[in-house]
């Protein structure tokens, strides 16, 4: 049972205000000395070092070797509705 002056449950504390200069300093040091371990970033960096643009998933220039499951089919795609 609680007494008249004490609230029940956890006490919520207010966050201290954040200064703008603290944010500017933090943004600069987020990934300063860390290598990015993303496979996408690694591929992009390799293509950049080779002097060419990385292939885009939105590009229509396909060679047919992008997937190991099936080769591209000749002709338009067939409809599943008839």
Swiss-Prot record:
Disruption phenotype: In one study, knockout mice show no effect on glucose tolerance or muscle function with altered extracellular matrix composition. In another study, conditional knockdown in skeletal muscle results in increased glucose tolerance in 2-month old male mice with increased expression of Slc2a1/Glut1, Slc2a10/Glut10 and Mup1 and decreased expression of Ostn. This effect is no longer seen at 4 months and females do not show any difference.
InterPro entries: MUSTN1
Name of a matching Pfam family: Mustang
Tissue: Expressed in vascular smooth muscle cells (at protein level). In the embryo, expressed in areas of active chondrogenesis including limb buds, branchial arches and tail bud. Also expressed in the embryo in somites, in the perichondrium of developing ribs and intercostal muscles, and in various dorsal skeletal muscles of the back including the neck trapezius muscles. Expressed in adult skeletal muscle. Transiently increased expression in the gastrocnemius muscle 1 day after hindlimb muscle reloading following 10 days of muscle unloading.
Biological classification of the source: Eukaryota, Metazoa, Chordata, Craniata, Vertebrata
Name by which UniProt lists this protein: Musculoskeletal embryonic nuclear protein 1
Region annotation (Disordered) ranges: 1-35, 50-82
Keywords: Chondrogenesis, Cytoplasm, Myogenesis, Nucleus, Phosphoprotein, Secreted
Gene: Mustn1
Protein family: Belongs to the MUSTN1 family.
Motif Nuclear localization signal: chain residues: 10-18
Gene Ontology biological process: chondrocyte differentiation; chondrocyte proliferation; embryonic limb morphogenesis; glucose homeostasis; muscle organ development; positive regulation of chondrocyte differentiation; positive regulation of chondrocyte proliferation; positive regulation of gene expression
């Amino acid at each position: 049972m609680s007494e008249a002056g004490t609230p029940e449950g956890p006490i919520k504390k207010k966050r201290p205000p954040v200064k703008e200069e603290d944010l500017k300093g933090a943004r600069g040091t987020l990934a300063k000395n860390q290598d990015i371990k993303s496979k996408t970033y690694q591929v992009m960096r390799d293509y950049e070092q080779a002097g060419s643009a990385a292939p885009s998933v939105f590009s229509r220039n396909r060679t047919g070797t992008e997937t190991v499951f099936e080769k591209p089919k000749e002709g338009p795609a067939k409809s599943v509705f008839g």
